[in-house]
Amino acid sequence: MIEADRLISNSFESRDDEVIDRAIRPKLLNDYQGQDHVRGQMEIFIKAAQLREEALDHLLIFGPPGLGKTTLANIVANEMGVSIRTTSGPVLEKAGDLAALLTNLEPNDVLFIDEIHRLSPHVEEVLYPAMEDYQLDIMIGEGPAARSIKIDLPPFTLIGATTRAGSLTSPLRDRFGITQRLEYYKVDDLKDIVQRSANCLGLSMEEEGALEMAQRARGTPRIANRLLRRVRDYAEVVGNGIICSDTAKKALDMLDVDSSGFDYMDRKLLLAIIDKFMGGPVGLDNLAAAIGEEKDTIEDVLEPYLIQQGFLQRTPRGRIATHRAYLHFGLDIPEAR
């Protein structure tokens, strides 16, 4: 099973869905819902950079997938009135790949590197002087005849995005002047996002319908927008085209997304811990084998939301299903763990 197979995964279902997602993304901070602390700070930092007519300081954005790191990077570029170049850590295989991007930037432009924790060490070393001194050190030739030349770069803003801030090396992390963590969204903020997206798509939707999707979206805008598109399909084919609470509930139940936003993989993981390992603790290797899933997928995709919502604990001895997990499935809570 791969993440893209899940309706509530954080990858895009299709190229069309990705195009729609980009179309409904907010373009400016005024349209950016939720993350109030991030929005407030970025407004100040951007205005200060504009007053000084400087490039914004380098920005690191981290947090779980689907919370809007790419959206925020594009908003920063729009607010600064500059262009943005987008790439990702795995794509930058050689130092020359990075050099080609840096030398084509205009003054104060934004270079956005997604999955920046996956940069190769050699490429990362080239990035250090570029970030710190706006200079590019290039080696010409090989062996004893090799020599280093320096190329001046225009001032620019590097925006790095990662779901694994702890995987960044200290030298790279320390070169970011601004660090922002994106948190899971509140239900009210997600409801506003769903309503805004529905308006962008020209859909008829009642507030209760938006609330139903927000409650099942796992605190994640990307999932909320995906649920909206699938509920729209259901409303147009089975209903009268209007997304009300009842229509949203029936559509989401049909899609096997329950009231807590769990799908069959979430339930499979929790029930495996409860039924096969007596509630835990269970090690990651055993859990992965029990549910037939990759360890990285469990750690990066399945567990974060379950832990954040209090259904799962990650301890030194292994994973433990909490009392809340037992209650979710209508099971008796064991007397002793």
UniProtKB/Swiss-Prot annotation:
<dbReference type="GO" id="GO:0005524">
    <property type="term" value="F:ATP binding"/>
</dbReference>
<keyword id="KW-0234">DNA repair</keyword>
<dbReference type="Pfam" id="PF05496">
    <property type="entry name" value="RuvB_N"/>
</dbReference>
<dbReference type="GO" id="GO:0048476">
    <property type="term" value="C:Holliday junction resolvase complex"/>
</dbReference>
<dbReference type="InterPro" id="IPR004605">
    <property type="entry name" value="DNA_helicase_Holl-junc_RuvB"/>
</dbReference>
<feature type="binding site">
    <location>
        <position position="175"/>
    </location>
    <ligand>
        <name>ATP</name>
    </ligand>
</feature>
<dbReference type="GO" id="GO:0006310">
    <property type="term" value="P:DNA recombination"/>
</dbReference>
<dbReference type="GO" id="GO:0009378">
    <property type="term" value="F:four-way junction helicase activity"/>
</dbReference>
<dbReference type="GO" id="GO:0000400">
    <property type="term" value="F:four-way junction DNA binding"/>
</dbReference>
<feature type="binding site">
    <location>
        <position position="185"/>
    </location>
    <ligand>
        <name>ATP</name>
    </ligand>
</feature>
<feature type="binding site">
    <location>
        <begin position="132"/>
        <end position="134"/>
    </location>
    <ligand>
        <name>ATP</name>
    </ligand>
</feature>
<feature type="binding site">
    <location>
        <position position="66"/>
    </location>
    <ligand>
        <name>ATP</name>
    </ligand>
</feature>
<dbReference type="GO" id="GO:0016887">
    <property type="term" value="F:ATP hydrolysis activity"/>
</dbReference>
<keyword id="KW-0233">DNA recombination</keyword>
<comment type="function">
    <text>The RuvA-RuvB-RuvC complex processes Holliday junction (HJ) DNA during genetic recombination and DNA repair, while the RuvA-RuvB complex plays an important role in the rescue of blocked DNA replication forks via replication fork reversal (RFR). RuvA specifically binds to HJ cruciform DNA, conferring on it an open structure. The RuvB hexamer acts as an ATP-dependent pump, pulling dsDNA into and through the RuvAB complex. RuvB forms 2 homohexamers on either side of HJ DNA bound by 1 or 2 RuvA tetramers; 4 subunits per hexamer contact DNA at a time.</text>
</comment>
<feature type="binding site">
    <location>
        <position position="222"/>
    </location>
    <ligand>
        <name>ATP</name>
    </ligand>
</feature>
<feature type="region of interest" description="Large ATPase domain (RuvB-L)">
    <location>
        <begin position="4"/>
        <end position="185"/>
    </location>
</feature>
<dbReference type="InterPro" id="IPR003593">
    <property type="entry name" value="AAA+_ATPase"/>
</dbReference>
<dbReference type="InterPro" id="IPR036390">
    <property type="entry name" value="WH_DNA-bd_sf"/>
</dbReference>
<comment type="similarity">
    <text>Belongs to the RuvB family.</text>
</comment>
<feature type="binding site">
    <location>
        <position position="25"/>
    </location>
    <ligand>
        <name>ATP</name>
    </ligand>
</feature>
<feature type="region of interest" description="Small ATPAse domain (RuvB-S)">
    <location>
        <begin position="186"/>
        <end position="256"/>
    </location>
</feature>
<feature type="binding site">
    <location>
        <position position="314"/>
    </location>
    <ligand>
        <name>DNA</name>
    </ligand>
</feature>
<dbReference type="InterPro" id="IPR027417">
    <property type="entry name" value="P-loop_NTPase"/>
</dbReference>
<feature type="binding site">
    <location>
        <position position="319"/>
    </location>
    <ligand>
        <name>DNA</name>
    </ligand>
</feature>
<keyword id="KW-0227">DNA damage</keyword>
<dbReference type="InterPro" id="IPR008823">
    <property type="entry name" value="RuvB_C"/>
</dbReference>
<dbReference type="InterPro" id="IPR008824">
    <property type="entry name" value="RuvB-like_N"/>
</dbReference>
<keyword id="KW-0238">DNA-binding</keyword>
<keyword id="KW-0547">Nucleotide-binding</keyword>
<dbReference type="InterPro" id="IPR041445">
    <property type="entry name" value="AAA_lid_4"/>
</dbReference>
<dbReference type="GO" id="GO:0005737">
    <property type="term" value="C:cytoplasm"/>
</dbReference>
<feature type="binding site">
    <location>
        <position position="70"/>
    </location>
    <ligand>
        <name>ATP</name>
    </ligand>
</feature>
<dbReference type="Pfam" id="PF17864">
    <property type="entry name" value="AAA_lid_4"/>
</dbReference>
<dbReference type="GO" id="GO:0006281">
    <property type="term" value="P:DNA repair"/>
</dbReference>
<keyword id="KW-0067">ATP-binding</keyword>
<feature type="binding site">
    <location>
        <position position="71"/>
    </location>
    <ligand>
        <name>ATP</name>
    </ligand>
</feature>
<feature type="binding site">
    <location>
        <position position="24"/>
    </location>
    <ligand>
        <name>ATP</name>
    </ligand>
</feature>
<keyword id="KW-0963">Cytoplasm</keyword>
<feature type="region of interest" description="Head domain (RuvB-H)">
    <location>
        <begin position="259"/>
        <end position="337"/>
    </location>
</feature>
<feature type="binding site">
    <location>
        <position position="70"/>
    </location>
    <ligand>
        <name>Mg(2+)</name>
    </ligand>
</feature>
<feature type="binding site">
    <location>
        <position position="69"/>
    </location>
    <ligand>
        <name>ATP</name>
    </ligand>
</feature>
